[in-house]
Amino acid sequence: YLFIKNNTADYGGGVYARYEGEPVFNHVTVIENTAGQGGGMRFRDNANPIISNCTIKWNISSGAGGGIYCNNADPEISYTSIIANVANEGGDAVYLKINCEANFMNTTFVSNGSPESDTSSAVFCVTNCSALFTNAILWGNLGPEIEFSSTSNPNFVTVNYSDLEDGQNGIVTNDNGTISWLDGNINENPLFCNSWDWDFSLAEDSPCVGTGIAGNNMGAFDVGCGPMMSINDDLPTQFSLKQNYPNPFNPTTTIEYSL
C-alpha cells in the first residue's frame, strides 16, 4: 500500500506521467495534493495508466482535473473511489481533454465539486474523447455527473449497469456528442453505509448490490453494513375536528379530534 499525500506541483500534484507507457497503480491512495492541472494525477501523450483498488480523494486543481487529468491518454480504472476532489475549470473528478479513451469499471464517483465553482462536473470531456462506465456509481457530485465541451469535436459516452444520479439527465452533452445508454442502469440512492464519515461501502439493501453485470455489485466497494432503517411514511393525510358537545356549555365541553 502506498500513500501519495500533501504534494504540490504545476502539473500532477501527486503523480505526473508522460509519453509511451502503462504505469500501474494498485492499492495506492492519492490524497490532499494540489496542482495547476491534475490535482491528484496527470497523464498525457500515451501514458496510459492502469489504476485499480485505489483511492483518489481531496485533491485540488486550480485549473482542470481535480482528481485525474488526461490528455491523449487512455486510463483503465477499476475498483477505485474518486471522492471529494475539486477543480476550478471543470472535471472535478476526471478531466479528459483530447483523444482519450477511458474505461471505468466498478468505480465510485461521489462528492466531487465545490459550491463555489460554476464549472463543476464529475467527469468532463473536451474533444474526441470516449468514456465507458460499467458497474459504476456517480452520485452526490455537484454539477452534471458527465459533461461534454460545447465547442470542440464531439465526444462519446457509454453507460451500462451503473447507478447515475438523474439518469440520462445527469449527462450534459451540450449538443456535442452521443450517449449510449445501455441495459442495467438505475437512478436510485446507492445507500452508502456512512457517507458522513466517508464510508462509501454499500448497505445490505442497496439497489447497487447484485445488480451489476453478471450479478456483481456496482461501485468500488462491497457490502459494509446491514440494511438501512426504513422510514414509515404511512402518515395521516386527513383529519377531522368535530363539533364540541354540549354546546353551549358551562363550564366544560368535549371536542373530538380524529386522524
What is the predicted role of each segment?
Residues 1-4, 17, 23-34, 41-199:
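Predominantly extracellular beta-rich ligand-binding scaffolds that present long acidic/polar faces
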Residues 183, 189, 197-199, 215-218, ...:
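Generic secondary-structure boundary/loop-capping signal
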Residues 186, 212, 240-242:
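Residue-level marker of motif borders
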Residues 193, 209, 242:
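Nucleotide phosphate-binding site architecture
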Residues 196-230:
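Surface beta-loop-beta hairpin patches that serve as ligand-binding interfaces in beta-rich domains
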Residues 232-245, 249-259:
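Glycine-centered coil/turn sites that cap beta-strands in beta-rich domains
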